[in-house]
Amino acid sequence: MFEGFDFSKMGQMLEDVQKQAKQMEEESKNKEFGAKSGGGLVSVRANGSGEILDISIDDSLLEDKESMQILLISAINDVLKSVEADKKNTASRMLGGLASMGIK
């Protein structure tokens, strides 16, 4: 597993990994994700940190509270799934970068 690995460079490698993680976290925060439900009657936008940035509800839903709640939950869950998938993808890319540093 550590064949050919130079342990004397471990401190610098850890520092590099921390920098890369911080950079990826910043990039993720700046990403925006969106989801719609009910054929676009409800739309939700979130950033890469999972913070909801905007919710749009079509006026036709204002009289139907139950439908609005169902569609809101659906759109919010979908946008949060997108954020989580992006986080997993980012972590996977970062772990792939470790292999290029000599950790196999």
From Swiss-Prot:
What GO terms fall under cellular component here? bacterial nucleoid; cytosol
Spell out the Pfam families in the cross-references. YbaB_DNA_bd
Q: Where is the composition biased (Basic and acidic residues)?
A: 16-34
**The keyword Hydrolase appears for this protein:** no
Q: According to its UniProt record, where is this protein located?
A: Cytoplasm, Nucleoid
* GO MF annotation list: DNA binding
Report whether DNA-binding shows up as a keyword of the record.
yes
Positions in coiled-coil regions: none
Per the record, which residues fall in region Disordered? 16-38
| SUPFAM superfamilies, sorted | YbaB-like (SSF82607)
- Alphabetically list the UniProt keywords: Cytoplasm, DNA-binding
Query: What Gene3D superfamilies does the database record attribute to this sequence?
Result: Nucleoid-associated protein YbaB-like domain (3.30.1310.10)
Its subunit composition reads: Homodimer.
Q: Which family does the entry's similarity section mention?
A: Belongs to the YbaB/EbfC family.
The record's section on NCBIfam families has: DNA_YbaB_EbfC
Q: What does this protein do?
A: Binds to DNA and alters its conformation. May be involved in regulation of gene expression, nucleoid organization and DNA protection.
Query: What protein does this entry describe?
Result: Nucleoid-associated protein Ccon26_18480
